[in-house]
Amino acid sequence: MKRLMVFGCLAGALACAACERIAHSEVSQKEEETVVRQGDVVFSLDEVARLFAALPVGEAQVAEVRDAVSASAGNGYDEEYTLQNLFEAPGSGIGSAPATRVEGYPEPLRDLLAAEVRRQYATRAVDPEAFLDALSESDVQLYWPFSEDFTTDEAPIVTFNPGDNASRNIGYIRREDGTIEEIVVDEEMARERPVWVVNRNIDAEYQTLEMRRREDPDWGQGGSILIRSGEGQDTRASGKDFKTLVLRSFKSKRNFDSWLAGGSEVWVKCGAIEDFTASTEAELRLYTPSITDFLIVVRRKDVGKELTFNAVLVSEWTGMLDNCAFMMVEDDGGTQTSWKCSAMVKYNSRSYGFEIEIPLRSRDDIIWRGALTRSYIEKYNGITGHFGDVDLVLELI
């Protein structure tokens, strides 16, 4: 949402479905996933997992993590508990307002963690307080897959995301005598007993549809519109008939990442010329494309399920709009690049393409991209359509 930037210009070309990638020098994806650089402090996810595994986690701490991941899931995110929240507001989830954050944990995880860091790092080169500050300011989090399936307060196995799309990893479990046992952990085990995964958060800075609708009831049912076409004009002033393109439902047919990385963060992006009613060449040049985008988080338990959204993609689709540019990506980070494409309109029996750059990042998995024509949408109006590994129900109403 905040990260989007739009550049619109008039181009007499057909809609483009090609992607232009920009080459960047980057650290390896494995290093980016597993090594954290926070100021002068550098640490690994494995190091953090070992710290959590050493803690005498009991009923109160399990309840704290359960409260946090449940709150995150209720706000449309994955089952996540960021270390920022762990230190600043124990038991709070991503998107939780300060007034709704849970208080009063008798012995929060942050206290146990701080005591363990001070004990282990007392004789190390890294200052314990600097390390704690780095942890609290980082994007590291605890991810508890399938948390809703567990009602007991059994102490968890703690593991971490080793990168490289690994399907299993070493986990650590604390025995009653305080010793740490290593165990191989896979997704099947995470379904059978509590497993906390130390990984990195990539979606906390963005708002899900649930958060948008809750915080701003007047905002509507769609995504974040960055630049509205015909900016400065009174939209709908022409009195022309228009329809609204709505995403009724969404179904992901597979997971796009390893379970150790969490669920799928899917960005839905749509570029179009809203309320296009130009009658002269001069009016034609007043229009600029709009890009609507929003985040859909698909938890692993929801793969294969049809999720209802009723989200607006194009609010004012007039008879002069031929198509829109549409893309879905699964967010995997990397450097900023874009997809150059066009949204087509008809004017005086001629087709014009408005050039659009829809942002994405270099490691994103492109699920589907291309032009959605009005004829296609009307033919399959309200009927499930197949877009790569995702099924959508689109409707012009």
Predicted regions and their residues:
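Sec-dependent signal peptide recognition
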Residues: K2-C9
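C-terminal motif of bacterial Sec signal peptides marking the signal peptidase cleavage site
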Residues: A15-A18
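Acidic/polar, low-complexity intrinsically disordered N-terminal segments immediately downstream
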Residues: E20-K240
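Short amphipathic, basic-aromatic surface patches that mediate peripheral association
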Residues: R236-A261
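Eukaryotic beta-sheet cores, primarily in C2 and C2-like/PH beta-sandwich modules
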Residues: V268, D302-R350
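Solvent-exposed strand-loop boundary residues in beta-sheet-rich modules
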Residues: A272-F276, D332
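Peripheral membrane lipid-binding modules
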Residues: D275-D322
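C2-type phospholipid-binding modules
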Residues: D332-I397
